[in-house]
Amino acid sequence: MNEQYSALRSNVSMLGKVLGETIKDALGEHILERVETIRKLSKSSRAGNDANRQELLTTLQNLSNDELLPVARAFSQFLNLANTAEQYHSISPKGEAASNPEVIARTLRKLKNQPELSEDTIKKAVESLSLELVLTAHPTEITRRTLIHKMVEVNACLKQLDNKDIADYEHNQLMRRLRQLIAQSWHTDEIRKLRPSPVDEAKWGFAVVENSLWQGVPNYLRELNEQLEENLGYKLPVEFVPVRFTSWMGGDRDGNPNVTADITRHVLLLSRWKATDLFLKDIQVLVSELSMVEATPELLALVGEEGAAEPYRYLMKNLRSRLMATQAWLEARLKGEELPKPEGLLTQNEELWEPLYACYQSLQACGMGIIANGDLLDTLRHVKCFGVPLVRIDIRQESTRHTEALGELTRYLGIGDYESWSEADKQAFLIRELNSKRPLLPRNWQPSAETREVLDTCQVIAEAPQGSIAAYVISMAKTPSDVLAVHLLLKEAGIGFAMPVAPLFETLDDLNNANDVMTQLLNIDWYRGLIQGKQMVMIGYSDSAKDAGVMAASWAQYQAQDALIKTCEKAGIELTLFHGRGGSIGRGGAPAHAALLSQPPGSLKGGLRVTEQGEMIRFKYGLPEITVSSLSLYTGAILEANLLPPPEPKESWRRIMDELSVISCDLYRGYVRENKDFVPYFRSATPEQELGKLPLGSRPAKRRPTGGVESLRAIPWIFAWTQNRLMLPAWLGAGTALQKVVEDGKQSELEAMCRDWPFFSTRLGMLEMVFAKADLWLAEYYDQRLVDKALWPLGKELRNLQEEDIKVVLAIANDSHLMADLPWIAESIQLRNIYTDPLNVLQAELLHRSRQAEKEGQEPDPRVEQALMVTIAGIAAGMRNTG
C-alpha cells in the first residue's frame, strides 16, 4: 500500500517545490518563508502539537492586508496541484490504474463463478446495459476553465516523467514545461470576474465532451469488448453503445430566470454545431485512411460509376460536404440569420450512420476487418453515443409554473380558475383536453411574460429535431395533475411524438407520496396509451436531505424507489429511475459502486440515469483515461446489481430504519427549523452571506430572495457548512438516532445490518467519510472569531453531538478509527488537511475583517474580498466536494 502512496507523495512534493520557486520569483523570499512557516506549523498542529496550533492561529491573524492574498493563493494553488497529482495517480501504472479497468474483468469472473448464472444470461445483461449520464452545471465547479486546461497539461507532464526511458534532456524539458505551467497558473486570476451565463456553462460541458469523452467512450468500449472476448468469448455488436450523455446546461430553468426559451434554442444549435465540428475531424481522418479499392457489389452500387475508383473515400467526401453545409447553416442560425435549409442538412443520426456502416460492412466482407475496426469503428460509436445533437438536453421546470400558466389560461377563457380547483377537477379537465381534437390556446391571447416563457419553451421542444431533447423534468412534483399539465402544454405546442416527462419527487412528503401519485397516473387509460410501457421518475437527493436530514431522506429515497419498482413491475411498465445526486454526501454523493449496490433490488433494470454535477464531472471525466475508469466502474456495478441483486431487507431491519428515520428527522428539524438561534448561528458561523457574492453559476443561490433555510438552495446550504468544516447537513440527526436504538438494546441488529445490508453499510461508510473531513477545532475557531457569544452554546452543543456520533458509528461498524476500510481515502484527506487548515483559519480571519468593516460603515477592502474568494475556492478544492 505504502509504495503506492510514495509515488503520489513524491509528485505532490515535487509540484509543491516548483510552486514555491514560482512564488519566490514572483514575490520574493520573505513571502515564501512566510508560507513555509505556516505550512510547517500546520503540519505539526495536525500531528497534535498544541503550542504550534496556537502559533498558527496567531501568525495568520497577524498577516497584513497585503500578505493575505499571496498566502491564500499559495495554499489554494497547492491544493489544485495536489488534486491534479491525485487524479494522475488514479490512472498511473504506479497508482490505482493497475487495478481500474480490471473492474469489468473482476465483475465478469465473479458472475461466471455463480452456478445459477449461465453465460447466456450474462450476455443478455450486457446487451441490456444502459447508462445515461446527465451533466449539470452546478455552481460547485469553482475552478475556471483556463486553469483546468493548465492542470490537464500538468497531468500530461507527470505521465511523461513517469517513463523510465526518457533521456536527461527530455526530463529537463518536461520540468521546464511544468515550471511554465505552474507560473502561468500563479499569474492567472483564479476567481472569475463575472458570473458565467447559461451559454458559458453549456460551452464548458462541450469542452468536457471534446477534451475527454470523445476519446474516452470508444476507449472504454474497446476495453469492455476485450474483457468480454476474454471472459465470455463474446464480441460487442457494432451498434451497441450502452452509454449516452445528456445535459442540463441550457435546459434547466428551475429557479434560474436566466435560462429562457431563446437560450435553450441557442444551446441546441450550438450543440449541433459542435457535433458537426467533431465529426468533421473524424471524417477528415477517414478520408485519408480509407484509400482501399476493393469493395462489395452493394457498396459499389451505392457509389455508382463516379466513385468506383475509391469507393470508401468517395462516400467519406460526400459525408464531409454534407457536414460542412450543415455547419455553415448552423453558424448562420447562431448569428441570427434566417437561411433556407440546405440540400442534405443533417438532422438525424441515421444520416451519419448509414454511409459509415456501409463502409464498415464492405471492409469486413472483403477481409479488411483490421481496418474496419480502427478509426471507422470509433466514429460509428461516436454516432451512437453523441450523434447529431452531441449531447441531448433535458428541460427542467418547477411544477407551479405550469399550474400558474394553466390558471391564467382558464381565467381568460372564463371557465374558472385552474389553480384553485381540486386535484380531481384538475385531472378531469386535463384528461378531457388531452383527448380533445381542438386546440385549447386561443390565437389572440396575450399571456403574461411568465406564462409566455412556459409556452415558448414548449414551442422550442416541438420544433427541435426529434431526439435532441431527452426528457422534461418537473421539479417539486406533488400530484398526477403536475405530470398531465406538462403533457397538455406540449400537446398545445404541436409536439408530434410522446416526450418522456419525469416527475421529480424531492421533499420527504413527496417521496413518501411518489408511489401513490404514479399509481394514479398508471390507472388513467389515456396515460397508459401515451407512455408505451416506459416511465421515468426522478428521485431528488439534495432537497430531501435539506428538508429532513440525511438519515430520514435516504430511507425515504430507498422506500420510494422500492415501491415504484414493485408498482411498475406489476403494471408491466419499464421504469427508469433518474437519480439527482450531488458530489457531496449531503446531496446523495457516494462512491459509485457502493451507491448503486445499496439501492433496492431491481432499481437498475431500466438502466441507470444519474446527474453528474459540477466539480464531479472534472474528477470523473476530466481525462480520457479517467473516463474509461469511471464508465468501467459504473458498468461493473450495474451488471452486478442486476444479476446479483442485494437481498430484500428483513422486516425487523425495515422497522429499525423507520425508527431511525423518525428520531433523526425530529432532531434535525428541531435544530434547523425550530431552534430560534439556528439561522442567526448559521449565517454568522459560515460564509453563507459571502457565498452569494461569488460569481459561480448562472443561477441565483435562493429560490426566493427572502426567507430562512428552506428558501436557500441545497447547494449553498451544503457548501457553507463544508467551508467551516462542521459538515452539519451530512450528519445531523443520524448518530443521535443510532445511539437511541443502541440504548434500546439493538446494537447487535445494527451490526448485522452493517454486515449484510449494502444500503445500511453504505450509509455508515458515508458518515465516516464526512466525519473524516470534518474538523471540530476549526469549527470552534470560526465560532470564536465570528459568532456572537450568546450563540456559542449552540455551536458547542452541535460539536458535542458530532463527537458522540463518531463514537457510535465506529462501535456499530466495529472499527477502531474512521475510514479503516478505505485507507486510500483517509490518506488523501490527511495529505490535503495540512494545506486546507491554514485556509480555514485564514477564512475565519477574513470574514471577521470583512464583517467588522461593514459594521463600522467602511467600504470593503478589495484585498480582503479577493483573498476571501480564494479561500472559498481553495477549501472547496481541499474538501474535494463543494455542494
Curated annotation (Swiss-Prot):
Alphabetized PROSITE patterns for the sequence: PEPCASE_1 (PS00781), PEPCASE_2 (PS00393)
Domain of life according to the entry: Bacteria
Active-site residues per Swiss-Prot or TrEMBL entry: 138, 546
Record keywords, A-Z: Carbon dioxide fixation, Lyase, Magnesium
GO biological process assignments: carbon fixation; oxaloacetate metabolic process; tricarboxylic acid cycle
The reaction(s) this protein catalyses: oxaloacetate + phosphate = phosphoenolpyruvate + hydrogencarbonate
Gene Ontology MF term list: magnesium ion binding; phosphoenolpyruvate carboxylase activity
Cofactor annotation: Mg(2+)
Pfam families recorded: PEPcase
Keyword Magnesium belongs to the record: yes
Enzyme's top EC category: lyase
Matching InterPro entries: PEP_COase, PEP_COase_bac/pln-type, PEP_COase_Lys_AS, PEPCASE_His_AS, Pyrv/PenolPyrv_kinase-like_dom
Reported function: Forms oxaloacetate, a four-carbon dicarboxylic acid source for the tricarboxylic acid cycle.
UniProt record similarity statement: Belongs to the PEPCase type 1 family.
Protein name: Phosphoenolpyruvate carboxylase
Provenance organism: Shigella flexneri serotype 5b (strain 8401)
Name of the gene encoding the protein in the UniProt record: ppc
